[in-house]
Amino acid sequence: MTRLIVAKFGGSAIGADGLSIPIIIQRINSLKKGAKVIAVFSAPLTIQNGMVRSFTDIVLELGKNAEKGEVPKLDELKNAYEKILELVSSDYQEECKNVIDSFLEKSRIALEDARQKGVFADEIRSRALANSGELLMSQVMNYIFKSQGIS
């Protein structure tokens, strides 16, 4: 019977703009010797105004500002994912970029809903956070794994 290992990699493990992803790949390759590995990923970190910040904190701030009527801009998140995209092989880059754009658009729409309704809570907040963080990062990591021949 094959062992099953579940490994969770939080934002700190992923690093700012995906800097530590190569270490995660090494770790997973090591873990999968004689075991099946299920990897779970949190939202990554990024650098904002010279400080390391979590995507979660940035999206919560964007949501709070949207609630007050500010038009949401996800440029910093997109820039961070573009840096992470460099870890995806050219075979999958365009497809992965489309996935990133699609998820970030869903997050932007949720933030725009918050702006229009004046409320950033519940389902709107969940959509904004999930589509910019954990769900998207899991998709991006899948492309990185494919690029590395990891299944």
Regions found by a protein language model. Give the residues of each.
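Nucleotide/pyrophosphate-binding catalytic subdomain
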Residues: 1-151
